[in-house]
Design a protein with these regions (language model features):
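Short sequence motifs at beta-strands and strand-loop junctions characteristic
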Residues: 171-173
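Periplasmic polypeptide-binding modules associated with outer-membrane biogenesis and secretion
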Residues: 1-167, 176-180
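Residues immediately flanking
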Residues: 183
């Protein structure tokens, strides 16, 4: 029963009902209908917040890209998204555009939110990616959620040192050492 409430909640959240939660539903059981049978009914609880019963659309999207070392920032538009990036920009706009599943004006879906965050993380060039949602006040549109994406670039080089004990085919055991260096953003464009 809990899984069904979660499934319904997820369906609603993917149809714009961003604030809907499984806890807003309850089961009513009737055992008087027939012997050894239970009639279940799924209802909304009486005190569900009004914001949970309203579908939301995506409002303004702002992407803030920061480097480890602070520098001057550029602001530009990419499709309908405002991007604020510190120079030098370490990702190509085309690649950044492909990672954004949310678009202004569309119904807000949690799947698109998760997909955007996952794809940005999988690029492997960011130390952290945070996606925040801000509801607008009633003057600009009470059914709109602004999206802010904050991503901080990671160090371009990573080094790892591994030590181990190895055994050869002649039954001799000896020390082993491995030093690895990897460049997370070799061409400085965010390529995978």
């Amino acid at each position: 029963l809990t899984l069904e409430r979660k499934r319904i909640s997820q369906l609603l959240r993917n149809r714009g009902y961003y604030y809907f939660r499984p806890e807003y539903m309850e089961y009513l059981a009737d055992t008087t209908v027939e012997r050894r049978r239970v009639a279940l009914r799924l209802n909304l609880k009486p005190n569900v917040p009004e914001v949970a019963l309203k579908p939301y659309r995506v409002g303004d999207i702002t992407v803030r890209l920061t480097n480890i070392k602070p520098g001057p920032a550029d602001t530009f538009r990419l499709r309908d998204v405002r991007v604020i990036a510190q120079r030098p920009m370490k990702i190509r706009p085309k690649i950044l555009s492909r990672t954004l599943s949310l678009e202004p004006g569309q119904l807000f879906t949690v799947d698109a939110q998760n997909r955007t965050q996952t794809v940005l993380n999988k690029l492997g060039i960011f130390r952290s990616v945070n996606l925040g949602v801000t509801p607008l006040d009633s003057l600009r549109g009470a059914d709109t959620l602004d999206v802010g994406i904050d991503a901080q670039f990671d160090y371009p080089l990573e080094a790892a040192l591994e030590t181990d004990v190895t055994s050869k085919s002649n039954s001799f055991i000896g020390p082993g050492i491995t030093f690895k260096v990897s460049n997370n953003n070799l061409f400085r464009g965010g390529e995978v």
